[in-house]
A protein has these predicted regions:
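Intrinsically disordered, low-complexity regions
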Residues: 1-176
Length: 176
């Protein structure tokens, strides 16, 4: 199925109030989306907003947290990272309240990815470490290893930035 078919299938599931399948198919649609050909970004946001409204009106906090995360991922995909972080934080707050450890760790990884884009590398590493600790406790060692590689990459990149700044200042490169 292509992304449009998956998105339509997701809408069908929502009409039947099957939130889990709605979100599963929505996520699959987002994984197959071609941002260069995307014209109707607001359709995706409005769709998720209507699911969020339904979840809140029907007191479905677990699904609400997943919809908030989907909103965060969607905004991130659309390169609206500040908006994405807002929804990631809301989702994490709810996931923590619900005690959903796997979802918390996954949400932290998504948040870290958006923090990295903002240039806040120290906070990114901190959030990645928090996710890694949870994955470690859950025995998800592959995830721990992936995060470790990300932290090493960010740490090295951060070090390079500091060195570059030092040399720019030392040799007054900005004055030319």
């Amino acid at each position: 199925m292509n992304h449009n078919e998956l998105f339509e299938k997701s809408k069908e599931f929502f009409e039947n109030r099957d939130i889990q399948n709605t979100l599963d198919h929505y996520q699959q649609a987002m994984e197959r989306i071609d941002r260069t050909k995307l014209k109707n970004k607001s359709d995706y946001i409005q769709f998720l907003q209507s699911i969020l409204k339904y979840c809140r009106e029907n007191n479905l906090p677990e699904q609400e947290a997943l919809v908030l995360r989907a909103l965060g991922r969607t905004y991130s995909l659309f390169k609206q990272h500040a908006e994405a972080m807002k929804f990631h934080y809301q989702s994490l707050k709810l996931q923590k309240k619900l005690g959903k450890r796997v979802e918390i760790a996954e949400g932290l990884v998504f948040l870290a990815e958006d923090l990295e884009v903002s240039g806040n590398y120290d906070e990114t590493v901190k959030v990645f470490r928090e996710a890694s600790e949870i994955f470690q406790e859950l025995g998800k060692l592959r995830k721990v290893k992936e995060i470790k590689r990300e932290i090493e990459r960010l740490t090295e990149f951060s070090k390079e930035i500091v060195e570059d700044e030092y040399f720019l200042n030392k040799f007054h490169v900005d004055n030319f």
